[in-house]
Swiss-Prot record:
Protein name: Succinyl-diaminopimelate desuccinylase
Keyword Transcription among record annotations: no
Catalytic activity: N-succinyl-(2S,6S)-2,6-diaminopimelate + H2O = (2S,6S)-2,6-diaminopimelate + succinate
Gene designation: dapE
Listed CDD domains: M20_DapE_proteobac
Keyword annotations: Amino-acid biosynthesis, Cobalt, Diaminopimelate biosynthesis, Hydrolase, Lysine biosynthesis, Metal-binding, Zinc
UniProt cross-references to PROSITE patterns, sorted A to Z: ARGE_DAPE_CPG2_2 (PS00759)
GO terms of biological process kind: diaminopimelate biosynthetic process; L-arginine biosynthetic process; lysine biosynthetic process via diaminopimelate
C-alpha cells in the first residue's frame, strides 16, 4: 500500500515534539516503518537531566550499498500561540496549504521519503534503505541525537554508504538548491577586565569597555578571506556585549562579548582562534578568550549521486538545482565523518516562523523527487 505523504505529515505534525521532548513522534514512525518491513531500533540516549529518543530503521540486504535518509522529529518552540492562524500541532490544511510546526523543518520531508519508500519494490533493491531520525537536532542536547546514533551504528556493525538529509534547502522554489557542504560555526567569548570605580574619578579606575570597543572594532574590520568557488566569505557577527552593570555612576570591572563566525574551508576553528587571540593581545593583556566549536566546514565534490538528485529534481520540477554551502549547521557535520552526505528538502522561507507552512503540492513533488532519486541510486526501473 502506497503512503500519502500529506496525510502522514498531518499525523506526524500532531505530535508536539518540541525539542528535546518526543511525545510519541519516534514511536509513531517506528510503527509505520515496521508495517513496511523495516527493522526498527528505538534508541534512547541522555544523562541525568534529559533523554533523547531516536530511531534507526533499515530494510534490505547487507550485500549492496545502504542509502540512508536522515532527519529529525524535534521542532522549535511555537512562539505566541495567539499569532498562529491555526493550532500549530493540528496539521490543518487551508487552501491546499499545510500549516504546523515542523511542516517545513522537517516533518514533511520525513514523510515524503517514507512515501517514496512505500512505492519501491524491495525485491529489486540491490542493497538497503535506512532511516536515521534524531529526536534533538534543534536544541542543546544534539549530542544525544545523531552523534550518539552514529556511534551505536558503528558499535553494532551497521553501515551507511550514502546519506540524504531532508533539511529545507530550497529557497525561491522547490528544487532550486541542494546542499553539498556546510560552513563551520565557531563561537567566541571575550572577557576584558578592568578596575571598578566611581565615574567621577576615572583616574582611580580602569574601564574595560574602552578595550572591548577597540577589540570589536578591529574584529569587525578584519577581512578573514574573500571566499572561494564553493564558499562565500567567512562572516563574523557580534552576538552580545554586556557588563552586568545596572548602576549609572559606576565604572564596571568586567565586560563580556560574544561573537560568532561562520567560516569556509579556508579556515579552521584553530586558525580563527589565533586571529581573534592576536587582535585581543594587540589591545590589552587583560583579557580571556574562550572558544566553542559547533562544527567545522566541509565540502563534498559533486559526484554521481548528487548528479542523480539533480536529475530527479529536473525530471519532477523541470528546474535546474544549484549546489550550495550556504546556511547554518546541520547534522550533516556529523554524518560527513561516516559517509558522503547531501541535503535536499522543501523551501525554508517559513521554517521556525509563526504559521510555518508548505503547499501540499510541494510535499507530493518532494515525494516524487525522492522516489526518482532512490530508483536512480539503485538503478531501478524509472517507468
Amino acid at each position: 500500500m502506497v503512503i500519502d505523504p500529506v496525510t502522514l505529515s498531518q499525523e506526524l505534525i500532531s505530535f508536539p515534539s518540541i525539542t528535546p521532548t518526543d511525545n510519541g513522534a519516534i514511536s509513531f514512525l517506528s510503527d509505520i516503518l515496521s508495517q513496511y518491513g523495516f527493522t526498527c531500533h528505538i534508541l534512547d540516549f541522555g544523562d541525568d537531566t534529559v533523554t533523547v529518543r531516536n530511531l534507526y530503521a533499515y530494510r534490505g540486504t547487507e550485500e549492496g550499498p545502504n542509502l540512508c535518509f536522515a532527519g529529525h522529529t524535534d521542532v522549535v518552540k511555537t512562539g505566541d500561540l495567539t499569532k498562529w492562524k491555526f493550532d500549530p500541532f493540528s496539521g490543518h490544511i487551508e487552501d491546499d496549504i499545510l500549516y504546523g510546526r515542523g511542516a517545513v523543518d522537517m516533518k514533511s520531508a520525513i514523510c515524503a521519503f517514507i512515501a517514496a519508500v512505500s512505492r519501491i519494490n524491495f525485491n529489486e533493491v540491490p542493497g538497503s534503505i535506512s532511516f536515521l531520525i534524531s529526536g534533538d537536532e534543534e536544541g542543546d542536547h544534539f549530542q544525544y541525537g545523531t552523534p550518539s546514533v552514529l556511534k551505536w551504528l558503528n558499535e553494532n556493525n551497521h553501515k551507511i554508504d550514502y546519506c540524504i538529509i531532508g533539511e529545507p534547502t530550497s529557497k525561491s522554489f522547490l528544487g532550486d538548491t541542494i546542499k553539498v557542504g556546510r560552513r563551520g560555526s565557531v563561537h567566541f567569548k571575550i572577557i576584558c577586565n578592568g578596575i571598578q570605580g566611581h565615574v567621577a574619578y576615572p583616574h582611580f579606575a580602569e574601564n574595560p569597555i574602552d578595550n572591548m570597543v577597540s577589540i570589536l572594532y578591529k574584529i569587525c574590520n578584519t577581512t578573514f578571506d574573500t571566499g572561494n568557488e564553493y564558499f562565500q566569505p567567512s562572516n563574523c557577527e557580534i552576538v552580545s556585549v554586556d557588563t552586568g552593570n545596572t548602576s549609572k555612576n559606576v565604572i564596571p570591572d568586567t565586560i563580556v562579548a560574544h561573537i560568532n563566525i561562520r567560516y569556509n574551508n579556508i579556515h579552521t576553528a584553530e586558525s580563527l582562534f589565533d586571529i581573534i587571540n592576536n587582535i585581543c593581545a594587540q589591545v590589552t593583556p587583560k583579557y580571556q578568550l574562550l572558544q566553542s566549536v559547533s562544527g567545522e566546514p566541509f565540502f563534498n565534490q559533486p559526484n554521481q549521486y548528487s548528479d542523480m538528485l539533480s536529475s530527479a529534481i529536473k525530471k519532477v520540477t523541470g528546474q535546474d538545482a544549484i549546489a550550495s554551502t550556504s546556511g547554518g549547521v546541520s547534522d550533516s557535520r556529523f554524518i560527513k565523518n561516516v559517509c558522503p552526505v547531501i541535503e535536499f528538502g522543501l523551501k525554508n522561507e517559513t521554517a521556525h516562523k509563526i504559521d510555518e507552512h508548505v503547499p501540499v503540492k510541494e510535499i507530493y513533488q518532494l515525494a516524487d523527487i525522492y522516489t526518482e532519486f532512490i530508483k536512480q541510486f539503485f538503478n531501478l526501473s524509472t517507468t
